[in-house]
Design a protein with these regions (language model features):
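Surface-exposed substrate-engagement region within the catalytic domains
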Residues: 1-37, 41-62, 141-221
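Substrate-binding cleft of extracellular glycoside hydrolase catalytic domains
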Residues: 48-151
Length: 221
């Protein structure tokens, strides 16, 4: 099923990647032979974007042809919502530097803005949507064309309904889900099934943003 979304692989091909540190990624890269990861997953925190920029300028040289997948956190160190501060322009300088770095990277970048937004009490839905649009409008005005946005939820029992957090088809390129338990992969697990149905309704491809057996490294089997 193709939706002709930004950076969507053709002919039902699947791109796989790994993270969450350069060391872990390098170990995984060296451990697999025929199917090297095409994507490197990393995190950026809005209050500490400068640190991410400095790190990424070094790490991107290690794998120059890699696709980036970035989880952009809009929370402070205590887990408090920073969407109002973003909307007030407090982090404009940091975000400008962030997008400038991405633009210079040139390779495709998948940006999971406010990933796992549906955790109960994490974000105010209206402010989340406004902040999402603010961030997207900012990088588009800067002429950054190598970003695809990923609306990434963790739709489990007990999380918030996702629909009130949707910024609109114009602002979302991909849907994304984070999965960590085997039961979440069951066809009988309604929250994820409904999320996937929503993706089809909006004609968006789906990315698995994060997934691994809890507390078990890939190299250990």
């Amino acid at each position: 099923m193709d939706f002709n979304a930004k950076f969507e692989p053709k002919e039902n091909k699947i791109i796989h990647g790994a993270g969450q540190s350069l060391e872990a990624f390098s170990n995984y890269w060296n451990a697999v032979e025929d199917y090297k990861p095409a994507m490197y997953m990393t995190y950026a925190k809005i209050p500490k974007i400068q640190k991410w920029i400095e790190t990424m300028k070094i790490e991107s040289k290690k794998f120059p042809n890699i696709i980036l997948q970035i989880g952009l956190k809009i929370l402070d160190s205590k887990g408090e919502d920073l969407t109002l501060e973003v909307l007030g322009g407090k982090y404009d300088k940091d975000l400008n530097e962030f997008f400038k770095t991405i633009k210079e990277f040139e390779n495709p970048v998948f940006l999971r803005i406010g990933y796992e937004f549906d955790k109960r009490g994490k974000y105010d839905s209206k402010n989340f949507i406004l902040a999402w649009k603010y961030i997207v409008d900012m990088y588009k005005k800067m002429g950054v064309k190598n970003i695809a946005t990923v609306w990434c939820a963790a739709p489990y029992n007990g999380t918030e309904p996702v629909e009130p957090y949707y910024p609109g088809d114009k602002y979302v390129d991909w849907f994304g889900i984070d999965i960590f338990l085997s039961r979440h992969l069951s066809r009988k697990y309604d929250p994820i099934e409904k999320f996937l149905e929503l993706a089809i309704e909006h004609k968006k491809p789906v990315m698995v943003g994060e997934s691994t057996p809890a507390e078990v490294g890939v190299l250990e089997g």
